[in-house]
């Protein structure tokens, strides 16, 4: 299958897919960090005599302490030390001290766009937030009168909101406080009435506000402003002045940001330079002018979900914000030290304490919502994670508050954010993925490329023009799949275009731009689905998401039917090794490749072998070149996990039949052939990490040793002399991986032992076995052991003397309960594995590999899978692979059907087998029952489908509990496999048993099997001794409920029903109270206090005796 049939060569090669991460971090190092340091320079003390300047332009970064691989091995952070030249000026005596100061460690991005924090690869997700700028909105009140408002949102600082009301008055709110007349604010800014009215297009509208407020001076306006913003404090003119200055005109407190200034200038047609990041009176006047014009139907209101009003904050900017937080804290410390210390002995090093900055950066990488543990299940998952856009996180939205509008697909998403790929569930629409050709510009807006069109001719020979959503709005843009002739002229009289957020049609000569590619609108994961245009969007969404969950298999196989993007996706994920130069391969083995370059030196490429990924899948690289091969720069020389020949290979091509089989594929279940198990078609390797540390305890150090008490020699035979398992040993659940003993405390010892110790001293010192064992349900082969000790100079957690890590690999064959899926959202669980001889077989005797339910197709509307399976069948018969770019109608109507039909006919002609394609039943063939050899009663669709095995493996989910831990308060068993929990018997299950009247089973479930503490101990005892199970007692949760009601002062008690009896006066005696709290088990709370009334009668001076 070496030759490739490519129908549509990609018209435009994709840009580097991880560039968004790298470019942003590069910007941070080159500009962002310098910008922040300079904004804090100089720092002066309170008297103004001492100044500390940061000479940020010359800052230095030291070589990282560890390489990337070494940092992963040692669980360290891959980072560099930052040094900034500083100058301390003492104005009293004119002394100047220059020094390089260490300001902290900065984690460094690897060339794959990730960070290594404490040995784990992490990704900083891009955040999509509302852009700073001015936004105009209209609202209709209950009388149908329309009012407008404008919000001036800065990057940081106070919000300013202007609004009109039904009486045509103008109001302003500062930071959502009380309303204030706009005239007061403008006067407080020092503008005269004539200046204000001259600047407005409709001064008569503003005049109403002036008349309502009356005439007043700037001083009166400032006092009024102060009263409104600081009610309760004595107002002063200087106070008002200072308040206004600090709120809007102090660059430290108020910052529009470069973007905010750019958006303001664009919206209000101002010419204020980019460097002015604070508000100016000009801005405020222009904003009010625009607001008044809206009342006269001039100008437009803004749509906050439009991508021209939302921008992307990538790593660099998020990190810059965090550095600002750290520098703010640092500035305070430096000021204090300047004041406290002796001025003569001051040096920059003694002033600058790197701790606050280090803490801020650590906090960001370690615990920010946007710093995520990288999804490393397969190369596609890794790539998608780096291109993710999240609306959540600090300064973003929250799941609960986000409405429908924010989540919805917006016309401006076209070519920028994928309309398909988003999670199902509460995050739907809040987390998206960057489209294939999209890029982020310097202001953080997403741009996408278009070819210009001149007089109906697409200029494909010119470089495409990148446009933001704002720039594109007033252009007529045709989609990427419009048909053109060989000269580039658009065919047809009517062309579908997008114009001003609307889908309309126009003539070819009216078109301004054409999209560069049909896959431009979707993300990388979605663009890997062939025949995407035949799938319902909901299923395409599942298909995109499930491709990211495919487990890398032992022998990857690239798809027979692909889309042509597989190679680029594999390349940019960083899993494959690319040659850096032209040259000749001089040496190859499993661990390294050496390439002799044309100009002399030899480059060695080291391969990753069987490394554990973040998701416990296996990372492994294999060479695909031979000695003597000539390689070009950028050529793939080694495959990674889930790639073959430099292309993404997430699953396997297998023979599938769409037919029911004995009900085993009811409700999306899947029936598979034993061949898939025997031939390791769907076998994957998983590597689990187990770790143990020997700590220093109060009673002495823990020891890693082979001398484990009360353990047979058999259990220790795989351990070396230090008590650590040998590499290559096969281990099962319960086996010791590392022997460890912990000193026992005095209290643990019986008296006779204490006596022995008193006589013989330390000799009889006792230890407890605390070894690391293989957990339940796990087994495998030990592939690596790493030992870290203080003596070797390793950095260990506090209190630990030694850390041992053991890596156990297991081969997992496919089995019943595993989840499989195709690329079209067709997912299912394996219900049965059938012997090969029982599987339905084709006329040439070939058994099918997998039987799917045909009812899974019509209602789900993912017909793409049928096209894929039939074209795959043609490809398998012809020995070819196909690349079909989605949206192929540009080559003619019904092109998918035509292509598949033609290829099937060709397959029949080439093979000479008529059954391969039957024109009477196109796409179907006679299939025989493997059990009887009889043909089934009707033809069946059979073909080659590309199926994935997903990471939801039954081995990781199956779980059983006999006895285990209980919750502290309710005493019920915990939940979940990790806690060794039980199965919840919820209210609906209880109803089911009630409906059947199964009283005793129900009673056991609610008492001895759950939280009747005494009863469950007795029941266990009875089972062990073979006696009958005693009567259950009261559940603990009922007692908790009683206690809670008592804590609300409700006197609730349980009484024993008895035969009514009367006292001497003929009154009925109360039923005797049963104290549920008196319990034989030791951990009991004290009994409830009761008041002894007889004691009160005897003595009047006692206030009230309480007996317990």
Curated annotation (Swiss-Prot):
Matching Pfam families: RNA_pol_Rpb2_1 (PF04563), RNA_pol_Rpb2_2 (PF04561), RNA_pol_Rpb2_3 (PF04565), RNA_pol_Rpb2_45 (PF10385), RNA_pol_Rpb2_6 (PF00562), RNA_pol_Rpb2_7 (PF04560)
Enzyme Commission code: 2.7.7.6
InterPro entries found in the cross-reference section: DNA-dir_RNA_pol_bsu_ext_1_sf, DNA-dir_RNA_pol_bsu_external_1, DNA-dir_RNA_pol_su2, DNA-dir_RNAP_su2_dom, DNA-dir_RNAP_su2_hyb_sf, RNA_pol_bsu_bac, RNA_pol_bsu_CS, RNA_pol_bsu_protrusion
Keyword annotations from UniProtKB, A to Z: DNA-directed RNA polymerase, Nucleotidyltransferase, Transcription, Transferase
Single GO term (MF): DNA binding
Signal sequence coordinates: none
GO biological process: DNA-templated transcription
One term under GO cellular component: DNA-directed RNA polymerase complex
UniProt region (Disordered), positions on chain: 1081-1108
SUPFAM superfamilies recorded: beta and beta-prime subunits of DNA dependent RNA-polymerase (SSF64484)
Origin superkingdom: Bacteria
UniProt record similarity statement: Belongs to the RNA polymerase beta chain family.
HAMAP family in the record: RNApol_bact_RpoB
Function (record text): DNA-dependent RNA polymerase catalyzes the transcription of DNA into RNA using the four ribonucleoside triphosphates as substrates.
Family matches, as NCBIfam families: PRK00405.1, rpoB
Subunit structure: In cyanobacteria the RNAP catalytic core is composed of 2 alpha, 1 beta, 1 beta', 1 gamma and 1 omega subunit. When a sigma factor is associated with the core the holoenzyme is formed, which can initiate transcription.
Classification via PANTHER family: DNA-DIRECTED RNA POLYMERASE I SUBUNIT 2 (PTHR20856)
Designated name of the protein: DNA-directed RNA polymerase subunit beta
């Amino acid at each position: 299958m070496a030759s490739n049939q490519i129908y549509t060569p990609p018209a435009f090669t994709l840009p580097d897919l991880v560039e968004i991460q790298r470019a942003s971090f590069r910007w941070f190092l080159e500009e962002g960090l310098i910008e922040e340091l300079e904004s804090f320079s100089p720092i002066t003390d309170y008297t103004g005599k001492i100044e500390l300047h940061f000479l940020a332009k010359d800052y230095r970064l030291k070589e990282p302490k560890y390489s990337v691989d070494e940092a992963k091995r040692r669980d360290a952070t891959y980072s560099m030390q930052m040094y900034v030249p500083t100058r301390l000026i003492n104005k009293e005596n004119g002394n100047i001290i220059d020094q390089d100061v260490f300001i902290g460690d900065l984690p460094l991005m690897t060339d794959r766009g990730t960070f290594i924090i404490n040995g784990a690869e992490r990704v900083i997700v891009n955040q999509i937030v509302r852009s700073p700028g001015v936004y105009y909105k209209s609202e209709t009140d209950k009388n149908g009168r329309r009012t407008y408002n404008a919000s001036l949102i800065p990057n940081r600082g106070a919000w300013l909101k202007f609004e009109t009301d039904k009486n045509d008055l103008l109001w302003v709110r500062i930071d959502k406080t009380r309303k204030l007349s706009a005239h007061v604010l403008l006067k407080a800014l020092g503008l005269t009435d004539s200046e204000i009215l001259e600047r407005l297009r409709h001064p008569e509208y503003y005049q109403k506000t002036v008349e309502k407020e009356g005439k007043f001076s700037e001083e009166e306006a400032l006092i009024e402003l102060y009263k409104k913003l600081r009610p309760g404090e004595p107002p002063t003119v200087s106070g008002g002045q200072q308040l206004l200055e600090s709120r809007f005109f102090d660059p430290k407190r108020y910052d529009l940001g470069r973007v905010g200034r750019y958006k303001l200038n664009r919206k209000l047609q101002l010419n204020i330079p980019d460097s002015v990041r604070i508000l100016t009176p000009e801005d405020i006047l222009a904003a009010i002018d625009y607001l008044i014009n809206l009342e006269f139907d001039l100008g437009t209101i803004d749509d906050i979900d439009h991508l021209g009003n939302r921008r992307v904050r990538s790593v660099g900017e998020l990190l810059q914000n965090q550095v600002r937080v750290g520098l703010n804290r640092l500035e305070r410390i430096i000021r204090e030290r300047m004041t406290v210390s002796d001025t003569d002995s001051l040096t920059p090093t003694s002033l600058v304490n790197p701790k606050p900055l280090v803490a801020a950066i650590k906090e960001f990488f370690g615990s920010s919502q946007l710093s995520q543990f990288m999804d490393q299940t397969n190369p596609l998952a890794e790539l998608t994670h780096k291109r993710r856009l999240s609306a959540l996180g600090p300064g973003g939205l929250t799941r609960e508050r986000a409405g429908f509008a924010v989540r919805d697909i917006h016309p401006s998403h076209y070519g920028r954010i994928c309309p398909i790929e988003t999670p199902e569930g509460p995050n739907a629409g809040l987390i998206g993925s960057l489209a294939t050709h999209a890029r982020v510009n310097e202001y953080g807006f997403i741009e996408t490329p278009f070819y210009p069109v001149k007089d109906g001719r697409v200029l494909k020979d010119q470089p495409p023009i990148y446009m933001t959503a704002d720039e594109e709005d007033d252009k007529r843009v045709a989609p990427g799949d419009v048909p053109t002739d060989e000269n580039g002229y658009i065919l047809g009289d009517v062309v579908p275009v997008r114009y001003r957020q609307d889908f309309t049609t126009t003539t070819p000569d009216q078109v301004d731009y054409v999209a560069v590619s049909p896959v431009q609108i979707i993300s990388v994961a979605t663009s890997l689905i062939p025949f995407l245009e035949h799938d319902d969007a909901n299923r395409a969404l599942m298909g995109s998401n499930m491709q990211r969950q495919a487990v890398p298999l032992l022998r990857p196989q690239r798809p027979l039917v692909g889309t042509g993007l597989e190679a680029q996706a594999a390349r940019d994920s960083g899993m494959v090794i690319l040659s850096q130069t032209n040259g000749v391969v001089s040496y190859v083995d499993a661990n390294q490749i050496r390439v002799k370059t044309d100009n002399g030196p030899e480059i060695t490429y080291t391969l990753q072998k069987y490394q554990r990924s973040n998701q416990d899948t296996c990372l492994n690289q294999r060479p695909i070149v031979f000695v003597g091969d000539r390689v070009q720069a950028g050529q793939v020389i080694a495959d990674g996990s889930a790639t073959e020949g430099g292309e993404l290979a997430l699953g396997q091509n297998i023979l599938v039949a769409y037919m029911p089989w004995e009900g085993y594929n009811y409700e999306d279940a899947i029936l598979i052939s034993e061949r898939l198990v025997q031939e390791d078609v769907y076998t994957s390797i998983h590597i689990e990490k187990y770790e143990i540390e020997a700590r220093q305890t109060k009673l002495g150090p823990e020891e890693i040793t082979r001398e484990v008490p009360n353990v047979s020699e058999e259990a220790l035979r795989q351990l070396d002399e230090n008590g650590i398992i040998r590499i290559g040993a096969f281990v099962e659940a319960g086996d010791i991986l590392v022997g460890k003993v912990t000193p026992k405390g005095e209290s643990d010892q019986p008296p006779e032992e204490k006596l022995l110790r008193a006589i013989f001293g330390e000799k009889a010192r006792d230890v407890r076995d605390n070894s690391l064992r293989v957990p339940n349900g796990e087994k495998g082969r030990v592939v690596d052991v790493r030992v870290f000790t203080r003596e070797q100079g390793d950095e260990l957690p506090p209190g630990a003397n030694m850390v041992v890590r053991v890596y156990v690999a297991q081969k997992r064959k496919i089995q019943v309960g595993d989840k499989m899926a195709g690329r079209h959202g067709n997912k299912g669980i394996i219900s049965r594995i059938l012997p090969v001889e029982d599987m339905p077989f084709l006329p040439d005797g070939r058994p099918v590999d997998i039987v799917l339910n045909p009812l899974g197709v019509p209602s789900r509307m993912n017909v793409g899978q049928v096209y894929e399976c039939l074209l795959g069948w043609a490809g398998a018969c012809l020995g070819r692979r196909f690349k079909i770019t989605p949206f192929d109608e540009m080559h003619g109507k019904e092109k998918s059907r035509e292509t598949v039909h033609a290829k099937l006919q060709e397959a029949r002609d080439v093979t000479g087998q008529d059954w391969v394609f039957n024109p009477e039943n196109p796409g179907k063939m006679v299939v025989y029952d493997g059990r009887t050899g009889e043909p089934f009663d009707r033809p069946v669709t059979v073909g080659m489908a590309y199926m994935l095995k997903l990471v939801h493996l039954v081995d990781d989910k199956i779980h059983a509990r006999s006895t285990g831990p209980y919750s502290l308060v309710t005493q019920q068993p915990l939940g979940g496999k990790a806690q060794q929990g039980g199965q919840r018997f919820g209210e609906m299950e209880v109803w089911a048993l009630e409906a059947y009247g199964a009283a005793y089973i129900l009673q056991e479930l609610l008492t001895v099997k759950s939280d009747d503490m005494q009863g469950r101990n007795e029941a266990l005892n009875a089972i062990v001794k073979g006696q009958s199970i005693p009567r259950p007692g009261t559940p603990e949760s009922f007692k908790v409920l009683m206690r809670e009601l008592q804590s609300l002062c409700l006197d609730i008690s349980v009484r024993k029903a008895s035969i009514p009896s009367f006292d001497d006066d003929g009154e009925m005696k109360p039923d005797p109270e049963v104290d549920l709290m008196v319990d034989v088990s030791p951990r009991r709370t004290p009994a409830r206090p009761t008041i002894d009334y007889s004691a009160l009668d005897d003595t009047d001076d006692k206030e009230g005796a309480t007996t317990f």
